[in-house]
Curated annotation (Swiss-Prot):
Function statement: Choline-specific phosphodiesterase that hydrolyzes sphingomyelin (SM) releasing the ceramide and phosphocholine and therefore is involved in sphingomyelin digestion, ceramide formation, and fatty acid (FA) absorption in the gastrointestinal tract. Also has phospholipase C activity and can also cleave phosphocholine from palmitoyl lyso-phosphatidylcholine and platelet-activating factor (PAF) leading to its inactivation. Does not have nucleotide pyrophosphatase activity.
Chain intervals for the UniProt region annotation (Required for enzyme activity): 71-77
Keywords, in A-Z order: Cell membrane, Glycoprotein, Hydrolase, Lipid metabolism, Membrane, Metal-binding, Signal, Transmembrane, Transmembrane helix, Zinc
Gene name of the record: Enpp7
UniProt-annotated catalytic positions: 74
Annotated GO MF terms: phosphoric diester hydrolase activity; sphingomyelin phosphodiesterase activity; zinc ion binding
Cofactor (UniProt): Zn(2+)
Organism expressing this protein natively: Rattus norvegicus (Rat)
Catalytic activity: a sphingomyelin + H2O = phosphocholine + an N-acylsphing-4-enine + H(+); a 1-O-alkyl-2-acetyl-sn-glycero-3-phosphocholine + H2O = a 1-O-alkyl-2-acetyl-sn-glycerol + phosphocholine + H(+); 1-O-octadecyl-2-acetyl-sn-glycero-3-phosphocholine + H2O = 1-O-octadecyl-2-acetyl-sn-glycerol + phosphocholine + H(+); 1-hexadecanoyl-sn-glycero-3-phosphocholine + H2O = 1-hexadecanoyl-sn-glycerol + phosphocholine + H(+)
EC number: 3.1.4.12
Protein name: Ectonucleotide pyrophosphatase/phosphodiesterase family member 7
Phenotype for residue 198 to A: Abolishes the phosphoric diester hydrolase activity against PAF
Length: 439
């Protein structure tokens, strides 16, 4: 056996032991808090005074903006953050659970508790960290209160159906609880979710005074959070990331702007076996047997602002359609236009779900802590890379994912610790790549 073949054999023996997910011995790692403020558009801090977000950027890292995954919905984008996968690869393709066979469709809050919707093959960072010896927590974060391959998050809280997302007093109480998890329960990773400014942006629109006032509340909460970190003596041991799932745009409401299926010439719902419409700018359809070509030909030019595709023709750049849960026809509309189905039931002033390349869908990224450089502004990046960064901060070996560990590496101070196991996997993967070319 040649020298290269021997090295390859050794690498193949060692590598599986490094990625089995079992507990590993590591140096003391810093803790990590990931905070998401739902629907915080990338430029919401430009028309409102945000002293706490500003000071966080001065003391840490700020991205010009972050590009979310498509489709720009809450649950799919949040799951991308904790799996590092594009939505077609992690399978949480919509805010709503749906079953195309029995026609069941469940709203967002009910879907949060549907285990099989989330546990469909991808392992989120909570479970990966726990399998490598850490405790984790999820406070209201989408996907954090179900089990994955039978394993639950160490500490978790889920909001109720009628939860008031605007209560600032409760926000502070939630921060207090998370601080206790870190200090009293020795949790290493927590994901903390706030439903604003998304709810306010939907109701009043992203350019409204109400949205601006809510951003001020968000900023006050960031200040309270950072003060809490200091009070609990976590400044030197806790890395903090503040981000979001997507942005928000103003809905066009003139009669000439409406995308209304029930008014399309030659279209009839009698040709449709399953529909998922009336959810912002996104839609899915399954025509009845033998009707696919007819329905497609009617819809593809039905409205200049509507883009209808057969599943196999959906733009690959979205990384969305290649999943068994995606229907035979799917569609999205241009920025500001929402899709109405049988009747008009959407009356939001603000909406998301649009093309993730539209600037109004971009969102924020801030980070501060012992592992991050100070006063650094980085170029825009995709949210799919955040998972690799978090694994690196925790010193854990990531699951297979679509991100790249080098993209966000420049944010980190030189000498920020990687676990030995993480280093070994990177080295061995390099060996395997090189040797595969010569063996």
């Amino acid at each position: 056996m040649g020298h290269s073949a021997v090295l390859l054999s050794v690498a193949l023996v060692i590598l599986p032991a490094c990625v089995t997910g079992g507990p590993v011995q590591r140096q003391q790692q810093h803790k990590l808090l990931l905070v998401s403020f739902d629907g915080f558009r990338w430029n919401y801090d430009q028309d409102v005074e945000t002293p706490n977000l500003d000071s966080m950027a001065q003391e840490g890292v700020k991205a010009r903006y972050m590009t979310p995954a498509f489709v720009t919905m809450t649950s799919p984008c949040h799951f991308t953050l904790v799996t590092g996968k594009y939505i077609e690869n992690h399978g949480v393709v919509h805010n709503m659970f749906y079953n195309t066979t029995n026609k069941v469709r469940l709203p967002y809050h009910a879907t949060l508790g549907i285990q099989r919707w989330w546990d469909n093959g991808s392992i989120p960072i909570w479970i990966t960290a726990q399998r490598q010896g850490l405790k984790t927590g999820s406070f209201f974060y989408p996907g954090g209160n179900v089990t994955y391959q039978g394993e639950a998050v160490t500490m978790s809280r889920k909001e109720g159906v009628l939860h008031n997302y605007k209560n600032e007093t409760e926000w502070r109480a939630n921060v207090d609880t998370v601080m206790k998890w870190f200090t009293e329960e020795d949790v290493s990773l927590v994901t903390l979710y706030f439903g604003e400014p998304d709810s306010t942006g939907h109701k009043y629109g992203p350019e409204s005074q109400e949205r601006k006032d809510m951003v001020k509340q968000v900023d006050r909460t960031v200040g309270y959070l950072r003060d809490s970190i200091k009070r609990h003596h976590l400044t030197d041991s806790l890395n903090l990331i503040i981000t979001s799932d997507h942005g928000m745009t103003t809905v066009n409401k003139k009669a000439s702007d409406l995308v209304e299926f029930h008014k399309f010439p030659n279209f009839t719902f009698r040709d449709i076996e399953f529909e998922l419409l009336d959810y912002g700018p996104n839609g899915m359809l399954i025509p009845k047997e033998g009707m696919l070509e007819k329905v497609y030909s009617v819809l593809k030019d039905a409205h200049p602002r509507l883009h209808v595709y057969k599943k196999e023709d959906f733009p690959k750049t979205f990384h969305y359609a290649n999943n068994p849960r995606i229907t035979s026809l799917l569609m999205y509309s241009d920025l500001g236009y929402v899709i109405h189905g049988r009747v008009n039931v959407q009356f939001n002033s603000g909406e998301h779900g649009f093309d993730n390349q539209d600037m109004d869908m971009k969102t924020i990224f801030r980070a501060v802590g012992p592992s991050f450089k100070a006063g650094l502004e980085v170029e825009p990046f995709e949210s799919v890379h955040v998972y690799e960064l978090m694994c690196q901060l925790l010193g854990i070996v990531p699951e297979p994912n679509d991100g790249h560990p080098g993209v966000l590496q420049p944010m980190l101070r030189s000498g920020s610790p990687l676990s030995r196991q993480h280093h070994l996997v990177v080295v061995l993967m390099g060996i395997l790549t090189g040797l595969a070319k010569v063996v």
